Amino acid sequence: MSLREWLIAIGTLVIIGIVIDGVRRMRRARKESMAISSGMGADELKDSPLDDDFNPELPNGGARTVSRSTLEDRGYLKRDMSAPVSTDQEDDVTPESGWSARDDDEDDGILSPPRVVKPETEESEPVEPEAVKTPATEVDRSKTRPSVPEKAKAEPEPRAEEPPVVTTEVEEDTARRTPNKPRKNQPLAGANRPEAREVLVINVLARSGEQFQGSKLKSLFEACGLEQGDMDIYHRHESEDTTTPVQFSVANAVEPGTFRPQDMAGLSTPGISFFMSLPGPTNALQAFEFMLETAQCVVRNLGGELKDERRSVMTPQTIEHCRQRIREFERKQRSQRA
């Protein structure tokens, strides 16, 4: 065979290989899209097997993400005997890379760029000067001088804990609130939640082999306007007044799911669960954005990954689907009142 015939044969094989690989990728993408789409349906929340399986990503398999049925079993949500409101159609979702601590520099256009709260300038550690060669005469003199004990050497002061970096809208909303305002005859935070007909869940799971520390979680929650209250979990109200509607709540992903104040200093957990129940907030879409920003704030400051209510990666498409569920719920609420 001539060189030309060899080149034609090789080119034909390369083209066939590219076509076969393209068909294989299309089939795999279609299967994954159907699996994710079927996994986000609101109609199947009651049948979620989420709490029956261990999460292999977490140490000892002890942490499980939280579904609506799990929240109801723990008593965080009141059961509603009426049929849950769900969307009639679900959009196909193309799998993309999820939100994680590595995604801080990327902007998907979903939220405004975060405002970084600059921590106080840390004291730089003292730099020891390089050793200088001295003449023999000076060395002899130094032998007669009393040696300085090592403990007397200057030691760097321990670094102060850096304040958490809070995203823009949550920071501004929390800053508008009156700190340490005295409360009289106000209910416990989260005690006024109505019966939930729709629940949106965002899980934040630590990376394999790592844990979230209770003291850091407490500081971050308080910086984001959350308050420890009913059911020994954290809640965020629309204002510092606990009679206002609850925007969202945060529970421990490990049984029994609580954040008791006396245990926060020594607490460590591989995951936490944010959940927002509908009806509830006056502005449900804004409450969801605050919940999402707070979850992303945990990822930014403490590491970890965002997961949805079925332990799947929280993609931009998943977040947009949650917003669509809120819009559909509000639309059906308006049609029922009409």
From Swiss-Prot:
UniProtKB keywords: Cell cycle, Cell division, Cell inner membrane, Cell membrane, Membrane, Transmembrane, Transmembrane helix
UniProt KW Cell division keyword: yes
InterPro entries with a match to the protein in the record: Cell_div_ZipA (IPR011919), ZipA_FtsZ-bd_C (IPR007449), ZipA_FtsZ-bd_C_sf (IPR036765)
Record bears the keyword Cell division: yes
Similarity remark: Belongs to the ZipA family.
Function field: Essential cell division protein that stabilizes the FtsZ protofilaments by cross-linking them and that serves as a cytoplasmic membrane anchor for the Z ring. Also required for the recruitment to the septal ring of downstream cell division proteins.
Protein name in UniProt: Cell division protein ZipA
Species: Marinobacter nauticus (strain ATCC 700491 / DSM 11845 / VT8) (Marinobacter aquaeolei)
